[in-house]
Amino acid sequence: MSRYRRIAANTRGRDLAVGDIHGHFERLRQCLARVNFDPSVDRLFSVGDLVDRGPYSPHALEWLAQPWFHAVQGNHEALAISHLRGGRVDLDMYRAAGGGWFLALPKAQQEAFVEAFLNLPIALEVQTAAGPVGLLHADSPFNDWTLLRDSLLYDDEPQVREVCQWSRRRLKEGDHHPVEGLRALLVGHTPVLDVQVLGNVWHLDTGGWRSGHFSVLELASLKLLSPAPSV
């Protein structure tokens, strides 16, 4: 698995991105229907945290098998990997964060999810006519995308991955410094009432997995679509 992945521009349809899903795939399906998502030509990019908290977490494997769906590895995917592969995981914390469904699975089924999660990159770069758009789960430890790319490809330092998957610093500090080398960087992880843009960093987790709504962003235009689900 490459921790960094570059994807060519979509020449047939639209590329859309969405915030944290957390097992609410049916709500997301409604949102996509409202923006006329066409899986035969369109693609959907996720900032990670596909699972935990919501009732349809097991559907993550079905979505990841679709050729039009692409995701980075979030901290909840990383927790599942750590649990099965001998890492240190506070099980009480993991259950409180919605991981009980995974812990209850037979080990063979856990392995199927972990294999899929291990195949997810930490960082995605999607080409658009107006310039590249990056995706991470939480934040970039560098204000230069090239530095992050090279670090993930050649160094693979745990502290770099930790920032990419767990950091809330940018939002907490109101850091407006852009990440150079990108037109926009799309992240989730920290819930916000409405999409927040700091510099060129878009925070997309608007709580579609709880009482909020999914925010869907078109990559080519950076146009925000925020349909509210009915369930």
Stretch-by-stretch model annotation:
Residues 167-228:
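Conserved beta-sheet core of the metallophosphoesterase superfamily
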Residues 132-153:
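Divalent-metal (often Zn2+) His-rich catalytic cores of metallo-beta-lactamase-fold enzymes
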Residues 57-126, 130-132, 155-168:
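Active-site neighborhood of divalent metal-dependent phosphoester bond hydrolases
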Residues 20, 49, 64, 74-75, ...:
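Divalent metal-coordination and catalytic microenvironments
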Residues 22-26, 52-55, 78-82, 141-143, ...:
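Active-site environment of divalent metal-dependent phosphoester hydrolases
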Residues 9-16, 125-134:
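Beta-strand-turn-beta hairpins that frame and shape the catalytic cleft
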